[in-house]
């Protein structure tokens, strides 16, 4: 009788795309996993700013941005699912209509009230706004991991909020203590 493997839980971890990632959507990406369970996984790409800043987005959704320091912060590509919808990753500050508390410290909010709070200065000071999210069905992420598609490491909020986006990939790799140039995109087989 085969021993069943305990399910893995990668919530509050970074997924780091392996060199040679065939999918251009995720090549060179770092994904913060907000949720991972037997039904699948949900995460946000944290290192892919798009050509829109907070001021422009707030204009489009008719919100008056009263706090100028955030006006020129970039909006990010969070993933290929629901790209017309905003997802805010932030420190657990405030109570919002639709928030997912990520075990380990951060929250992901999808309701407009968090943007209203950011706009008037009463919201979280550390946040990352994405359009879209990254999603995997049951067993899909585990399959990609078994095929050498991703590296995983415990997430560090400082990388999300304090490191420039173009340096987040290498900063996440450094958490593993490895040299990315020494990795092959091919899995070895005996």
Swiss-Prot record:
Pfam families per the record?
DUF179
Spell out the NCBIfam families in the cross-references.
PRK00228.1-1, PRK00228.1-2
UniProt similarity note: Belongs to the UPF0301 (AlgH) family.
Biological source species:
Cupriavidus pinatubonensis (strain JMP 134 / LMG 1197)
Q: Name one GO cellular component term.
A: cytosol
The record lists its disulfide bonds as: none
Q: What HAMAP family would the database entry show? A: UPF0301
- Please state what the protein is called: UPF0301 protein Reut_A0705
Q: Which domain of life is it from?
A: Bacteria
């Amino acid at each position: 009788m085969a021993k069943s493997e305990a399910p893995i839980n990668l919530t509050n971890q970074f997924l780091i795309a392996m060199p040679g990632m065939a999918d251009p959507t995720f090549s060179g990406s770092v994904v913060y996993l907000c949720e991972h369970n037997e039904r699948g996984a949900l995460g946000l790409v944290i290192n892919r700013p798009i050509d829109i800043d907070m001021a422009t987005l707030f204009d489009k959704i008719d919100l008056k941005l009263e706090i100028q320091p955030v006006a020129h912060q970039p909006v990010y590509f969070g993933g290929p699912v629901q790209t017309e919808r905003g997802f805010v990753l932030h420190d657990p500050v405030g109570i919002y209509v639709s928030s997912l508390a990520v075990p380990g410290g951060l929250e992901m909010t999808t309701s407009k009230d968090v943007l209203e709070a950011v706009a008037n200065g009463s919201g979280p000071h550390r946040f990352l706004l994405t359009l879209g999210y990254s999603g995997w069905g049951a067993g899909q992420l585990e399959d990609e991991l078994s095929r050498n598609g991703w590296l995983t490491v415990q997430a560090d909020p400082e990388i999300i909020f304090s490191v420039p986006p173009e340096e987040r990939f290498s900063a996440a790799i450094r958490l593993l203590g490895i040299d990315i140039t020494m990795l092959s995109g091919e899995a070895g087989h005996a």
